[in-house]
Regions:
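A short C-terminal boundary segment appended to hydrolase-like catalytic domains
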Residues: 171-222
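Short, structured patches in soluble enzyme cores that scaffold and shape functional sites
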Residues: 50-55, 93-95, 180-182
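Short acidic, glycine-rich surface-loop motifs adjacent to enzyme active sites
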Residues: 80, 84-100
Length: 222
């Protein structure tokens, strides 16, 4: 079965400053067999663009927080615009680009909210993230509000007010259903469910984002 793996801040070597600077993703790539850089999955019904928001080091004290730079944003937006008409367009990254109010921790992604709006302009339906260890689904404030920031829980024992969980995502022409599958001690069971109306503009050639033309917000980004 296809697997799509995104690197996160816990994949960075904690104690070795040299490894953080020069080879932060070596252990991740060796363990998963997947490259730790922006990449994508494409099929007729699904397009997933992965963006690395974790950094080996950065110019602030808390290196666990996220960053998405302008080049990453533009390249991901261009890839999203190339998705087949009608396909579910997903942007996957470790840190939430849109913060959940009341979450036990934050991603504090530099340029995160601006990037989320650019991705929505490019046709994204889901921005799928982790990091905060609790599941959520929030609309992105743009156009018809049918682009969503969706966070998943964690399979770690480091709980932050929610049981260990993962998200199961199902979709049809009209809705996306996100089910947080929580660990109850001996098995996973549905815990929270969000039924999200799908964007309809990306399902028609006449209204889908132009694959050859950047949107206004993307053009204006500096």
């Amino acid at each position: 079965d296809p697997r799509f793996v995104i690197v996160g801040n816990h994949d960075v070597p904690y104690w070795s400053l040299m490894a953080r600077v020069f080879s932060p993703w070596k252990a991740f790539e060796r363990a998963t067999g997947h490259p730790a850089h922006d990449h994508e999955f494409l099929s007729p019904d699904l397009m997933v663009r992965g963006v690395v928001t974790a950094r080996g080091w950065q110019a602030r004290m808390n290196w666990s927080k996220g960053v998405i730079d302008l080049d990453q944003t533009r390249q991901a937006a261009e890839a999203l615009r190339q998705a087949p008409v009608g396909a579910l367009r997903v942007l996957a990254c470790h840190h939430p680009l849109v913060e959940m109010i009341g979450a036990p921790m934050t991603g504090e992604v530099k340029r995160g909210e601006a990037a989320a709006r650019i991705f929505a302009e490019a046709g994204v339906e889901l921005i799928a993230t982790g990091h905060v260890h609790v599941p959520f689904a929030l609309p992105i404030s743009l156009a018809d509000h049918c682009s969503y920031a969706v966070g998943c829980g964690t399979l770690s024992h480091r709980e932050r007010g929610a049981p260990p969980s993962f998200n199961q995502i199902d979709w049809d022409a009209l809705h996306i259903t996100v089910t947080a599958m929580a660990w109850i001690g001996d098995r996973f069971e549905p815990d929270q469910v969000w039924r999200l109306p799908r964007r309809q503009d990306t399902r028609l050639p006449a209204t889908a984002p132009d694959p050859n033309q950047a949107g206004a917000m993307e053009k204006a980004a500096v």
